[in-house]
Amino acid sequence: MPQFFLNKRLIILLISIIVLVALVGFSLRDRENASWPEQFVKDVVGFGENIVAKPTSFISGAVDGVVDLKNTYTENQHLKERLEELAQLESEVADLKKENKDLKESLDITDSIRDYDPLNASVISRNPTNWNDQVEIDKGSSDGVKPDMAVTTPSGLIGKVTTTGAKSATVELLTSSDVKNRVSAKVQGKENAFGIINGYDSDTKLLELKQLPYDMKFKKGQKVVTSGLGGKFPAGIFIGTIEKVETDKMGLSQTAFIKPGADMYDLNHVTVLKRSAEAGTTDDDTTSSDTTGGQ
């Protein structure tokens, strides 16, 4: 009896193996429609893959977006830095061009003045509270600079030295509000007219040339230069041009309003006119200066 059941189990096992092999073979055959168990398994697996794939794809895309955004930001920062560097370079080039032009024109001044030793200098400071009054330059007594020396730019006279240190000096501008600031000048024409630069209108930005003869006619655009009568400034340094002329209240003299040739607002490179040994100031010069009341 036990032998029978043993054989029966063996037979069932063999039949099961045969059926399983048949099912496997059947499932491996090419056919258009899958059985419902196969389709069920495929649907479950596909649904699971879809659930996993979408978040994974979203996260991957988000990470890629963040990386791209960071790269774009970094690139923009580099471009911005380059633009700033180019802007700075352009500004430096413009400053160098202007400086080169000023220095070339300063050399032209050097060639045009014979009895004076021109000394080129740079403006190192300017007080905003008295912008029209003074500037500081980088040349002083150790360079031979002395008070009352004329200071010019390529465009014309700007003022005179008032005080000196060893390595710097103070220049009082023609536009100074100091009533004692005077320069002897003349209006060029068929007949020269002499007067004194004394005063500045900050509203019109015009110098005042006073004590001109009441009976002389003047035209807009006539040139005004230093007269040299003060004995300290060389004659012929350009100051500016006439804009208009007014007669004083008493009718005894005229005042011409002069547009400065030099840009008094923007001063960078200047020239100090040092008196040479042959053209030094004498007692006669000092007397002349006191008589005319100007430089």
Curated annotation (Swiss-Prot):
Record bears the keyword Cell inner membrane: no
Protein name: Cell shape-determining protein MreC
Region (Disordered): 276-295
Coiled coil: 66-112
Tree of life domain: Bacteria
Endpoints of the signal sequence: 1-34
Keywords, comma-separated and alphabetical: Cell shape, Coiled coil, Signal
GO biological process: regulation of cell shape
Cited NCBIfam families: mreC (TIGR00219)
Family: Belongs to the MreC family.
